[in-house]
């Protein structure tokens, strides 16, 4: 992505301000729609596993924390993508039924400084690991090896008070409302 693209967050997420708005709103262009499958990965203490990543090179944006997950491939169900992504990003092998029912589908819109925008829906499942879970990053893609800064378990209250950017837009509010007291 070109360095003139900067997203704007909604809600309680920290704001990354646009440098300008297009003079003609009709000139906005919808770049793409992206479906993602993500997992609320919890440990027995109720802490949430998150991965801190860079944006695409050249954006100049600050890093953000994401749950394990990624894009749904063509011909793949959301559940199949969640199982695949969980293995690729954490090394954790689970059967689809272990993820249970879809917990959340969070639509989002990323607006860029050029006036262009992307839309998407992040679909979330929940899984609780056993105390002996060990993170395995051996299945990461080259992009993940380049983009991942760190990963860790977060107490939800600490995360929400940290000032860290959590994505996608709207996720911080969901965590605050549905994972309170953890």
Predicted segments with their positions:
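Nudix hydrolase/Nudix homology domain
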Residues: 2-6, 57-58, 63, 133-182
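Acidic, metal-coordinating catalytic segment for phosphate/diphosphate chemistry
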Residues: 2-45
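Short, P/G- and charge-enriched loop/turn segments at secondary-structure junctions
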Residues: 20-29, 110-115, 138-140
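A generic structural micro-feature
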Residues: 29-32, 61-64, 115-121, 143-148
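Active-site-adjacent beta-strand/loop module that shapes the phosphate/pyrophosphate-binding cleft
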Residues: 43, 106-137
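Conserved Nudix-box catalytic region and its N-terminal flanking loop in Nudix hydrolases
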Residues: 47-89
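A short coil-to-beta-strand element that immediately follows conserved catalytic motifs
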Residues: 93-104
């Amino acid at each position: 992505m070109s360095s003139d693209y900067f997203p704007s967050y909604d809600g309680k997420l920290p704001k990354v301000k646009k440098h300008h708005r297009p003079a003609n709103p009709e000139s906005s262009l919808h770049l793409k729609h992206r479906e993602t499958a993500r997992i609320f990965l919890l440990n027995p203490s109720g802490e949430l596993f998150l991965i801190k990543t860079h944006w695409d090179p050249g954006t100049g944006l600050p890093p953000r924390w994401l749950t394990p997950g990624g894009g749904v491939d063509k011909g793949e169900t959301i559940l199949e993508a969640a199982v695949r992504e969980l293995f690729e990003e954490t090394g954790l092998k689970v059967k689809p039924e272990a993820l249970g029912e879809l917990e959340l589908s969070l639509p989002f819109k990323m607006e860029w400084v050029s006036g262009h925008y992307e839309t998407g829906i992040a679909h979330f499942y929940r899984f609780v690991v056993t105390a002996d879970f060990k993170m395995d990053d051996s299945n990461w893609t080259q992009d993940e090896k380049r983009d991942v800064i760190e990963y860790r378990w977060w107490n939800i209250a600490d995360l929400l008070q940290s000032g860290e950017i959590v994505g996608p837009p709207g996720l911080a509010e969901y965590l605050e409302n549905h994972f309170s007291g953890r």
